[in-house]
Regions:
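Low-complexity "stalk/linker" and mucin-like segments enriched in Ser/Thr/Pro/Ala/Gly
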Residues: 361-383
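Active-site-adjacent helix-turn-beta-strand microarchitecture at beta-sheet edges
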Residues: 53, 146-219
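Conserved, well-ordered active-site substructure
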Residues: 155-172, 179, 213-267, 277-322, ...
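Beta-strand-rich structural segments
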Residues: 336-350
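A short beta-strand micro-motif common to beta-rich folds, especially ectodomain repeats
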Residues: 379-395
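Zymogen propeptides
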Residues: 5-171, 186
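Short, solvent-exposed loop/linker segments at the N-terminal edge
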Residues: 330-336
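Conserved beta-alpha junction segments in alpha/beta enzyme cores
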Residues: 64, 68-72, 77-83, 202-233
Length: 395
């Protein structure tokens, strides 16, 4: 279905008088900018105030949202929130350099692990995602990927658990995030049973347990961070914060990350590797290329140990199904002018050619082209006066 980016664009309806306003440009806010109240969006427990949020569709059940915030000291932080609904056509895979290789089969990969022939080494997260796609029998397509555990930077060996396709490569003294045989996600302490685990990677620290922030987390050392959490409904959340790049992004403390995850609905979460290793790569809906979306502090994507791959198992056929409109689900500062763009997508979110505009208009009567968007505020409410491209929901 075609869904317009914001329900009250083009005068369809007006927002409530107390609607939160946020701007989409620029990423850096003026010192005296009027900001939304922290309690309206995730991340407020540690004094994080959102400035902008930009959500992109990735695939069925998968989104990636860029969140620009200001911390309690007034410094800017840029984070990336990935949300994965495991009830959709999507799953998660652990990966390691050399495990998935050209033309390999599950039987060959199992024999490699059982025979102790998987060598410790490092490669980029995006390279591991590409290798998954070149194996002969892997399912689906990698649509999002992120780095995982701490590792020995000399050898590439992860410090904690690593299980791929049910093959136990390594254990350790760290808690681990796992996908079970029934497809659900869990986080378990070190030493837990792994007989029902299909995929697993570790992280050195628990951040959230039983819906509460773990006591004693560091509150001062702000740097790039990465993490994974699970909500009560079973959906999975990745959250990465860029850092060491002031004034663009100072980074976050462990406590701030835990606070953000808790406010995002996570009932359990672990910390993954941060620093220059922190990587988020995604293939946005309507495109075919997996690209690094965050800003690694090294200036480029670092080689890492293991990774987590988000795999869409939906059918990518290249046939036009809908338009992927960006930006999506945003609110804008009064007076902003916002141009929308559209890409063709198939039913799985893969790239597809957009039909010619006259045909699209003929088959989609709720497609409306109007003037550039301009949002103006009066003392009582915000009014939408139109947008470049507005698409009402088509049932």
């Amino acid at each position: 279905s075609l869904v317009m980016p914001q329900a009250w664009a083009a005068g369809l309806q007006e927002p409530e008088p107390d609607a939160v306003v946020q701007q989409t440009q620029p990423d850096t806010a003026e010192p005296d900018a009027q900001l939304p109240q922290a309690d309206t969006l995730a991340g407020n427990a540690a004094g994080l105030t959102p400035i902008t949020r930009t959500k992109n569709a990735v695939a069925s059940g998968v989104t990636l949202e860029k969140v620009v915030m200001r911390n309690v000291n007034g410094s800017q932080v840029v984070g990336y929130l990935s949300e994965i609904d495991l009830s959709k056509d999507v799953t998660l895979k652990a990966s390691y350099t050399g495990y998935y290789y050209d033309g390999s089969t599950a039987a060959q990969r199992k024999a490699m692990v059982d025979g102790g022939k998987l060598k410790w080494e490092m490669s980029q997260t995006t390279a591991q995602a590409a290798a998954y796609g070149r194996a002969s029998d892997t399912e689906g397509r990698v649509v999002l990927a992120t780095n995982a555990d701490y590792y020995n930077m000399q050898t590439g060996a992860p410090t904690g658990y690593l299980i791929m396709e049910g093959n136990l490569v390594k254990t350790g003294a760290e808690p681990f995030f796992a996908i079970l045989k029934d497809g659900s996600a869990v986080i378990r302490p070190a030493g837990s049973d792994t007989s029902d685990v299909v995929e697993a990677v570790s992280g050195p620290y628990m951040l959230v347990e039983n819906g509460q922030i773990v006591p004693g987390l560091d509150q001062g050392d702000r740097m790039p961070r990465n993490s994974v959490g699970i909500r009560a409904d079973g959906s999975v959340v990745f959250f990465e914060a860029d850092g060491r790049q002031e004034p663009m992004s100072i980074g976050m403390s462990m406590y701030e990350v835990a606070s953000f995850l808790k406010d995002a609905g996570c009932v359990t979460a672990i910390y993954l590797d941060g620093g220059g290793s922190a990587t988020v790569a995604a293939r946005y809906e309507g495109t075919d290329e997996l690209l690094v979306r965050n800003s690694p502090s090294d200036g480029l994507e670092r080689t890492v140990s293991d990774a987590l791959l988000v795999v869409s198992t939906a059918r990518f056929d290249g046939d036009f199904d809908h338009a992927s409109v960006s930006p999506q689900n945003e609110l804008y500062t009064p007076g902003s002018q916002v141009a929308f763009t559209a890409l063709g997508a198939d039913s799985a979110g893969g790239a597809a050619d957009l039909p010619p505009l006259p045909d699209a208009a003929a088959t989609a009567p709720n497609l409306v082209l109007t003037a550039p968007a301009c949002y103006e505020a009066d003392p009582e409410r915000i009014r939408a006066e139109g947008c470049v491209l507005s698409i009402r929901e088509i049932v």
